[in-house]
Regions:
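Short hydrophobic alpha-helices and adjacent helix-cap/hinge residues
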Residues: 1-242
């Protein structure tokens, strides 16, 4: 599914919550707290606004946004948690590492999109029956983690060592690591596992990748690596590292 279609779908899910204003002469303004570790301008919010508009929720008429950003730094959101929880929002929209801070928002509906495991993150009891006050979707697929290794091997038949760059606090990261290792073992590929915890540690992690002597690099996707994707791509190009 294309990103625009997906976020429009999220808008539809969000619109199912606020029914209190129906039948009122003066429409209620529904307040959305948008919490993100994306860099500004946020690539997702324009599509979300459009999806909400298509369902009758128009910013400036019956919809308002409160925007809070901490690009690549979820710790800043955790520090700002008292302020965030004090925002008089009808529901919260969040994604990626920002969800870690939103776990404390137990009194409001939270709409999420994550690349990790919602169960490991602690925001869902199971994928089939999430429970709690969170709803959304995950892009995580352990089958895809294995396919990435297989694809690299097809592109580089002589590959014997693969560097794994991973933001270690990403929920579900351990499962993704295990699935990748199993695929690598099946193809007789050794792994150089290089974890880091946050954006400020990325330079050191990339230096360890350079020193690993790997034939290729695999980056586990999450909000932090997405924010720093240009730096990671420039590094790979400079090292001629697939």
């Amino acid at each position: 599914m294309r990103r625009r279609e997906f976020i429009a779908a999220l808008g539809g899910a969000a619109s199912a919550w606020p029914h209190a204003a129906q039948g009122q002469a003066t429409p209620k303004t529904h307040v959305v707290l948008w919490v993100s570790t994306e860099a500004q301008p946020d690539p997702f919010i324009a599509s979300f606004r459009e999806g909400m508009r298509e369902r009758g929720y128009v910013e400036g008429q019956n919809l308002a946004f409160v925007l809070r950003y901490a690009p690549g730094d979820p710790a800043r959101l955790r520090e700002a948690l008292p302020e965030l929880l004090g925002v008089p929002a009808d529901f919260i929209v969040s994604s990626g590492p920002a969800i870690l801070a939103m776990r404390a928002a137990t009194g409001k509906p939270v709409l999420f999109a994550v690349s990790g495991d919602p169960v490991a993150l602690g925001i869902a009891e199971s994928l089939a029956r999430p429970g709690r006050n969170f709803t959304g979707t995950t892009f995580m697929s352990l089958d895809v983690a294995q396919k990435r290794v297989q694809l690299l091997k097809e592109l580089l038949p002589g590959m014997s060592k693969l560097a794994i760059l991973s933001q270690k606090n990403h929920p579900g990261e351990q499962s993704e690591h295990e699935a990748t290792r199993a695929a690598a073992d099946a193809l007789s590929i050794s792994l150089a596992y290089i974890p880091f915890a946050a954006g400020p540690e990325l330079d050191g992690a990339l230096q360890r990748v350079a020193e690993a002597g790997a034939n290729a690099m695999l980056v586990f996707p999450d909000g932090v690596t997405m924010v720093h994707r240009a730096k990671i791509a420039d590094f790979a190009l400079s090292r001629r590292l697939p």
